[in-house]
């Protein structure tokens, strides 16, 4: 076998180890927010997944602008915790990206479902116009592992109401 053929075969049959790396872009409202929780947009060349949606709809709107500015297709929003500072900001995101699936582990979904109304009753008056007028309960993740533009992402500690995410190619933990 010639070197040229060997090089061609190696190129054709090598897995996507040379795929473009994922970009990790974090938003945190800092002192402007009631809770300085981070939301992270992880994207490849075409796709993007948002991890956590902020506490207020105002910060959710800032995420909408960040995602639009990326030029990527938002496929999914993963909620890593059942606490409202991770999902109250979903309303503007769902309006802007209606095709994006909102997902979480079963335990996170159960926690949100069980506590969302009481949390909104408590926090809504304090948040004033930053409070959501509509709450979203995520769908249960079909699998704790999924891909972003060919790169593996794993949701860890799925038995907890506060999971975390491992992105091996970016050597990143979120949540």
Where are these regions (language model features)?
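Active-site metal-binding motif and surrounding structural segment of the metallo-beta-lactamase
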Residues: 58-104
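Short catalytic-loop micro-motif centered on adjacent basic/acidic residues
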Residues: 49-52, 75-80, 154-155
